Amino acid sequence: MSLFPSLPLLLLSMVAASYSETVTCEDAQKTCPAVIACSSPGINGFPGKDGRDGTKGEKGEPGQGLRGLQGPPGKLGPPGNPGPSGSPGAKGQKGDPGASPDCDSSLANPERKTLQTEINRIKKWVTFSLGKQVGKKLFLTNGETMTFDKVKALCAQFQASVATPMNQAENRALQSLVKEEAFLGITDEETEGQFVDLTGRRLTYTNWNKGEPNNADSREDCVVLLRSGGWNDVPCSSSHLVICEFPV
């Protein structure tokens, strides 16, 4: 039996089968030819171009960024108020005894002698120009006149007292300084007619002028030395020469 008559028949069967598959694909897809639609997926193409920017969105809530670096130190502020005092510290230990001042005293003696010599020289100069020295008293005047209370205050300022003669020699020394009436440290302010010195002691020496004291107008409670050397009672509010008495 020959094979060639069967070949056309075989080809016809294959075409019929192929056609049958094509019709079935159209019924399922109903689009492009069955050969393209029913073939295997192709290879992916190149990416397309970027699309246009969309519309601008609404502003978002503020966010918190990363913590920055520490900044430089600021300027110094004003000083604060002083704080309260602290508690007292513990008592320290007793210190060692100090060095003996023997050497210092030996050096001070010559200096002390020099100073005393200078003081004596000044005393002599002052006595010669403005005062008189009698025994252990030095009488000095500044040549001013003032009331009795001011005379007392001025003499006290120099650790002295108002001149008070206790004997004839002292009275003569004061008389040599007087070119006008000078206050003496004698009053009867406490008891009228009873004259005492400024310490309250009764007088053991007096040299009243004739007819004195007379307490004229009942207000003469102080005493002045006249140029003649005699004494006279006067009002304490009157102004007379200042003479102070210094111990020597």
UniProtKB/Swiss-Prot annotation:
Coiled coil: 112-130
Annotated spans, Disordered: 43-112
Residue(s) carrying 4-hydroxyproline: P47, P73, P79, P82, P88
A single cellular component GO annotation: collagen trimer
Post-translational modification comment from the UniProt entry: Hydroxylation on proline residues within the sequence motif, GXPG, is most likely to be 4-hydroxy as this fits the requirement for 4-hydroxylation in vertebrates.
Biased composition annotated in UniProt, kind: Basic and acidic residues: 49-61
Major location category of this protein: secreted
Superkingdom of origin organism: Eukaryota
Record keywords: Calcium, Coiled coil, Collagen, Complement activation lectin pathway, Complement pathway, Disulfide bond, Hydroxylation, Immunity, Innate immunity, Lectin, Mannose-binding, Repeat, Secreted, Signal
PROSITE patterns on file: C_TYPE_LECTIN_1 (PS00615), C_TYPE_LECTIN_2 (PS50041)
Gene Ontology molecular function: any one: D-mannose binding
InterPro entries listed in its UniProt record: C-type_lectin-like (IPR001304), C-type_lectin-like/link_sf (IPR016186), C-type_lectin_CS (IPR018378), Ca-dependent_lectin (IPR051077), Collagen (IPR008160), Collectin_CTLD (IPR033990), CTDL_fold (IPR016187)
GO biological process, one term: complement activation, lectin pathway
First and last residue of the signal peptide: 1-20
Subunit structure as annotated in this protein's UniProt entry: Oligomeric complex of 3 or more homotrimers. Interacts with MASP1 and MASP2. Interacts with MEP1A and MEP1B and may inhibit their catalytic activity.
Free-text note regarding domains: The coiled-coil domain mediates trimerization.
This protein's name: Mannose-binding protein C
